[in-house]
Regions:
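Short S/T/G/P-rich N-terminal loop/turn motif that feeds into the first structured element of a domain
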Residues: 1-67, 73-85
Length: 85
């Protein structure tokens, strides 16, 4: 299993959260297995995927980029991946 971490700053947590929750169907369709977020304004989200390739494809998807813009993400996110051992 691969976990993708995404950290970014948002201009307004409430706006970001609404968009994040509305994006749930696309997340699941792209292979997201779990999710969490906390600390308004400085967001770290984790998503679990079956493998690295699926996680990387989701991270590069146009749907994710569009959703982040609409949600008020400020600047480029920091994204990294881990594998369970």
């Amino acid at each position: 299993m691969t976990t993708m971490f995404v950290r970014h700053t948002v201009s307004n947590y409430s706006v970001w959260r609404k968009h994040y929750d509305e994006f749930n169907g696309i997340q699941k369709a792209k292979g997201v297995k779990a999710q969490s977020a906390d600390n308004p304004g400085d967001i770290t989200v984790t998503h679990d995927f079956p493998d690295l390739e699926t996680a990387q494809a989701f991270a590069k998807s146009d749907e994710l980029k569009t959703a982040m813009r609409g949600a008020g993400v400020v600047g480029a996110p920091t994204i990294w991946f881990t594998n369970k051992v």
